[in-house]
Amino acid sequence: MAEKGITAPKGFVASATTAGIKASGNPDMALVVNQGPEFSAAAVFTRNRVFAAPVKVSRENVADGQIRAVLYNAGNANACNGLQGEKDARESVSHLAQNLGLEDSDIGVCSTGLIGELLPMDKLNAGIDQLTAEGALGDNGAAAAKAIMTTDTVDKETVVFADGWTVGGMGKGVGMMAPSLATMLVCLTTDASVTQEMAQIALANATAVTFDTLDIDGSTSTNDTVFLLASGASGITPTQDELNDAVYAACSDIAAKLQADAEGVTKRVAVTVVGTTNNEQAINAARTVARDNLFKCAMFGSDPNWGRVLAAVGMADADMEPEKISVFFNDKAVCLDSTGAPGAREVDLSGADIDVRIDLGTSGEGQATVRTTDLSFSYVEINSAYST
């Protein structure tokens, strides 16, 4: 077994290959297979109403609470391709199911890459044959994590060791990150023996406070998908709280790695809001600031410009006392009661990590944190070139 990643838990194998879908010639297809003895599965998907064909197919197939294998391709999102896109997604599922001796409904499928281009089905089907060839499936979690990358600069794996059972995972995504997950594909695996209901509760709880609070550029992908597959191979059934904690730890670690590798990132920024009526209002306010381009530019310039924070948060759908707002950068007060604090302009933000804390002054119990990044020259360069 691997020390980390999707094949760290018992009962899982993976493979990866280069099918020629990516123009770069880098590996671009991966396969994760649950060998059992159990096949419980949970998933969460994008909330974007314009969702990709693989999201539609995976939603249908996971509805019965079981998935035995998940197919990944990178370099083509198979999104906004109409009926042909759905036909292609279903064809890939059928091809894989036939090769593995499974039913179509046993398969999840995930795609990431450019929107609006048809899948090269000849390459995809040949890639499926390579992924399922004799000897291909094994302890190849690291290779699978590399194969699903698009504009990522590093692969992202995790592992959480519990009391006799394990949660592993891989993820990708560095841009188009906003609430409702990110341009993000994540696969979590566990050898715990759990029901589908337990898995869904753990996954939903974890994503709500990890991936859903990662907001790099305010864009929500058409393809966001997080799977949690459970093999039961450890023979151990954790409590719901134990499962929740392990899945949260895995999601939190991957989310931190997504933030650290965000497109063009030079600053990792945590925006925390307190002092509003409830947590929903707090996250609205934190997200409003995290998405503000002037604020993000100030972070890029290591500029403790608290005025941009106030200007942004004042537009948030949250209860606040406009004359009692306080702002702290790295625990140093820069604004108290909506007025500049002594030494505010001298606060050092030259480090890579910046914590921003905003108190909206109502004495309410709402609080939330959103993770974001700065807005750099490199981000613009990367995304101006990522097209046809």
UniProtKB/Swiss-Prot annotation:
Q: Where in the cell is it found?
A: Cytoplasm
List of catalytic residues: T183
- Family in the record: Belongs to the ArgJ family.
Which protein are we looking at?
A: Arginine biosynthesis bifunctional protein ArgJ
Task: Locate the residues binding substrate.
Answer: T150, K172, T183, E263, N383, T388
Extract one GO molecular function annotation from the record.
glutamate N-acetyltransferase activity
Annotated source species:
Corynebacterium glutamicum
Q: Which gene encodes it?
A: argJ
Q: Subunit notes for this chain?
A: Heterotetramer of two alpha and two beta chains.
Q: Which CDD domains match?
A: OAT (cd02152)
UniProt keyword list: Acyltransferase, Amino-acid biosynthesis, Arginine biosynthesis, Autocatalytic cleavage, Cytoplasm, Multifunctional enzyme, Transferase
